[in-house]
Amino acid sequence: VLYLNQALRKGWRFSSYRSESGAEVDLVIETDRDLIGIEVKAGRNVSPADTRGLVSLGELVGRKRRFKKWIIYRGEWKQRFDNGVEAWPVIEALKALR
């Protein structure tokens, strides 16, 4: 992701998130149009429990700006949870960020 930002001269800003209750998001990308919360999972499976930090950050952001909630994982299928979080295979996520 850092390489994409540099190579494509995107000008993205990076941070992370942790709430007082311990909910975390590994990477937050701020683009000109969007805020993208990314939780990175090493496994091949994801579950609704993996969405906790993204949902917490989404509640904080509210409707102030468009917020995409992504989990990037080593699985093969793109998934969408009922709470709006999307799970992306690594390669598909990198292509989508371009």
Tell me what each language-model feature is.
Residues 1-98:
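A cross-kingdom feature that marks ATP-driven nucleic-acid transaction machinery
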